[in-house]
Amino acid sequence: LSRFPIVDHRYVRFPDSGNDYLQADVKVGDDTVRIFSVHLQTSGISGLRQRFRKDHGRDVPVERVIGELERNSRIRAQQVREIRAVIDSTHYPVIVAGDFNDTPSSYTYRRLKGGMTDGFRAVGNGFGGTFRYLGGVLRIDYIFYDDRFAGVGYYMPQDDVSDHKAVVAELRFRRI
C-alpha cells in the first residue's frame, strides 16, 4: 500500500525458507525510489525450544541451540548477499526496511547497511529495542536509507500486532 504510485515491483521468496523480500519502485514527484521490504531468516530458537520440550519434556541442550544459531546465521548471510547485490546494481535512491532478525553488531546488519544510514542511529532515541521479549532491548528491525535522503524522525508506534514493534522513519530528499 502506498500513497505514491508503484511503477514496478518484484517479489522474491528465498528457497527452503519462509522468508522473502519485496522490491518496489515508487514514483515520488519526479523521482523514483526503490524500496526493499525484507524478512530474513529467524534465529530459530523459539521454535526449537517448543519442539524439543514437546518431544523430550525438557529444555534444549546448549549444543543444539548453538547449532541452530549457526545454521540460521549462514542462511541469513546468504539472503543478505542476494539482497545486497540487487541494492548495489540499482541507480535509484534506496530504502531498506524490515525484520533482519539480527543485532547491530552482526554481519547481517553491517553487510546490508553498507554505506547507508541507520534511521534509528541518525534520528531515533532511547534503546530502540524492537523485539518485545527478552527484556525488550533487542533491536532486530531496521530502516536504512542512502545518502540521497535525510532523516527527519524515527519512532515506534504503540501496537501489539506482533512480537516485533513497528518502526517508522520520516525522510526527505536531500537536494544536491
For every predicted segment, state its role.
Residues A77-Q78, E82-I95, F100-I176:
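Metal-dependent phosphoester-hydrolase catalytic domains
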Residues G18, F52-K54, R111-G115:
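Glycine-rich, phosphate-binding/catalytic loops in enzymes
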Residues S46-Q50, Y107-Y109:
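Short aromatic-enriched loop/helix-cap "lid" or pocket-rim segments at secondary-structure transitions
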